[in-house]
Swiss-Prot record:
The lineage of its organism: Bacteria, Pseudomonadati, Campylobacterota, Epsilonproteobacteria, Campylobacterales. Its main location: cytoplasm. GO terms for biological process: L-histidine biosynthetic process; L-tryptophan biosynthetic process. It comes from the Bacteria. The gene is hisA. One of its GO terms (molecular function) is 1-(5-phosphoribosyl)-5-[(5-phosphoribosylamino)methylideneamino]imidazole-4-carboxamide isomerase activity. Pathway: Amino-acid biosynthesis; L-histidine biosynthesis; L-histidine from 5-phospho-alpha-D-ribose 1-diphosphate: step 4/9. This is 1-(5-phosphoribosyl)-5-[(5-phosphoribosylamino)methylideneamino] imidazole-4-carboxamide isomerase. Keywords: Amino-acid biosynthesis, Cytoplasm, Histidine biosynthesis, Isomerase. Belongs to the HisA/HisF family. SUPFAM superfamilies: Ribulose-phoshate binding barrel. Its EC number is 5.3.1.16.
Amino acid sequence: MEIIPAIDLKEGQAVRLTKGLMESAKIYSDEPWRLAKSFEELGAKWLHIVDLNGAFAGEPKNLESIRKIRESCNLKIELGGGIRDEATIKRYVELGVDRIILGSVAMKNPEFVKEMASRYKIAVGIDAKEGYVAAEGWAETGKVKATELAALFREVPLDAIICTDISKDGTLEGINREFTQAIAEASGHYTIASGGLASEEEIPLLAQAKGVDGVIVGKAFYEGRIDLGTLYKRLSGCLN
C-alpha cells in the first residue's frame, strides 16, 4: 500500500478544496516546494500534484511552482490538471514528472489516452459524482458510469488508475471503499484511492480491498488528523 501525500496548486499556493469547489479553497502554504521537501523527509516516496487552475483552464497554470517542487525533492511525482495534449505531456515529462494523470480527456477522448499510454507512464484519473464521471475540474458531469470508463482501459498499459468520489473529497468523512474497489475490479489496474481519507485506521481497511494499492493523503494531513512520519514508520515492514 503506497501512501501518497498531495499538493493541490491554486495560483502558486498549496490549497485544499471541499467537494471540488474552487470557492472552498483553504490555503495551507505559500511555498509548496517546502511541503514537498518535508514529505520526503517524513518518508514519502511519491507525491501527488494537481494544477487546479489548469484543470479549469485546460492548460498548465502553475508551471513555475511545479518546476520548483521538482527541483526541491527527489520524490517521484504524479501530476494532473488540465493535461489535454501530447505537447503538455512532453513538457511535464521533460520537467521530470514521473507519471502523468489524464482525467477529463479520458472520458472525452479515450483513444488519445490509449495512444499516450503506449509512449508515457500514464494514470487515468476517474472522478465521479453519484457514480458518473465528472470532468473539466469537476464542473461537468457526463453520462458515463465510472466503472464503465475503468473497464474501457482494462487492456491498456496504464501505470495506475486514480479514483475519487467527489462527494467525499476534502470532507474528512472517509474514503468510499466500495466505489474504489469497484473501480479496481473493473479496470484490473494498480488503483489509488482518493477523496475523504479521515484517519490512519482507514488505511488497513483499504489495503484489504481487492486491487486497491495506494491512497492519497490530503486534508487529513493538513488538518493534523494523520501524522505521516509516524505512519510511514509504522507501515514499513508490514505494508510495501
